[in-house]
Amino acid sequence: MKIHEYQAKQLFRKYSIPVPEGLLCTNLQEVKTALKSLQLPIAVKAQIHAGGRGKGGGVKLGKTATEVVQYADDILGMSLVTAQTGPSGRTVSKILLEEGVSIARELYLSILVDRERACITIIACQDGGMNIEEVAASTPERIGKIHINPLIGPRSYHINQAREWLNIAQEQARAFSLFIHALYKLFLDYDCSMVEINPLIITEDNQLIALDAKVDTDSNALFRQRELQKMHDPAEDDPAEAEAAKFNLNYIKLSGNVGNMVNGAGLAMATMDIIKRAGAEPANFLDVGGSADAERIENGFRIILADTNVKAILINIFGGILRCDILAQGVVQAAAKVSLQVPVVIRMEGTNVKEGREILAKSGLSLINATDLNDAAEKISTLLTD
């Protein structure tokens, strides 16, 4: 789960991680009130769950009260488009006003779960304020990775490595060590998948301050994170993903043209590869799960069809706990309730596959059967090129 920058900084304050003084505002009256307690210049920062806000015009520095109010008026209610929002953008309903600070250097620092190495990794780079993915692609040698055994935690040599990567002076070693330990503790305490500071700044008087803050947490751990549950912002959820969650469907909306429905995350990933192989792009990730019933299949089908970008659908099921006849019943129910305007390719094997195929054959639906994954890829490719 993602939280807003202002919420991440609330957590930072709990762990004595330095952040600028700031106030959250949702309207111009609150902005005018905030100006009475904040010192100029003031940064006006849009609060949405996406990076690249500055490039999209969602972060402005006001040097006078008049400028701050004007920038706030411009940003509140705007549809902010960044590389992470897609062309439709996100509507800004909250802004963070923060006191400006004197910046001597901008750095990048993050702690994340490294799934390839099965450890926690500190990422350090001197190119702060930039898109770290762009730096990794163009100059990967500038990024330091310090791998930490989660059973042991960060040791002094780990922190020294990070400090050297960031070229932080020896005089700041103790402050930096306290900073890392606090950040790491926050990371563990809140079941985070990533904590990112971009930029981490060194001020002209040699203070370390988190100018920005991003905290992503493991949604599977939310049952024990009541504080984070309260930080969830439904307005930032994708409507289709929110609808899918009501039916316990693991759905992630993507930007492609082929919808897919699969049981099992691994098979879903393989199916997305097959779609790419066909020269198309997946429109979603949808794992209906092993215990799905006809109603859940129907709802998954309906959610896929609600995406106007979908030009074809690939259903790939290996019947086990989810029997093929149950899948077929769900598809038939869904087709009876929605207007099926796109071709559907079905590949299913496993438990009750014969019964499932009979149900589909008797339904009268114009469905395209595939014998295996390669056949499914060929049929999808043919459909999209005809």
Swiss-Prot record:
Binds 1 Mg(2+) ion per subunit. This is Succinate--CoA ligase [ADP-forming] subunit beta. Mg(2+) binds at N198, D212. The keyword Magnesium applies. Heterotetramer of two alpha and two beta subunits. Its cofactor is Mg(2+). HAMAP family: Succ_CoA_beta. One of its GO terms (cellular component) is cytosol. Substrate binds at N263, G320, I321, L322. It catalyses: succinate + ATP + CoA = succinyl-CoA + ADP + phosphate; GTP + succinate + CoA = succinyl-CoA + GDP + phosphate. One of its GO terms (biological process) is tricarboxylic acid cycle. One of its GO terms (molecular function) is ATP binding. Pathway: Carbohydrate metabolism; tricarboxylic acid cycle; succinate from succinyl-CoA (ligase route): step 1/1. Succinyl-CoA synthetase functions in the citric acid cycle (TCA), coupling the hydrolysis of succinyl-CoA to the synthesis of either ATP or GTP and thus represents the only step of substrate-level phosphorylation in the TCA. The beta subunit provides nucleotide specificity of the enzyme and binds the substrate succinate, while the binding sites for coenzyme A and phosphate are found in the alpha subunit. InterPro entries: ATP-grasp, ATP-grasp_succ-CoA_synth-type, ATP_grasp_subdomain_1, Succ-CoA_synthase_bsu_CS, SUCC_ACL_C, Succ_CoA_ligase-like_bsu, Succinyl-CoA_synth-like. Its EC number is 6.2.1.5. ATP binds at K45, G52, R53, G54, E98, V101, E106. Residues 9-243 form the ATP-grasp domain. Disulfide bonds: none annotated.
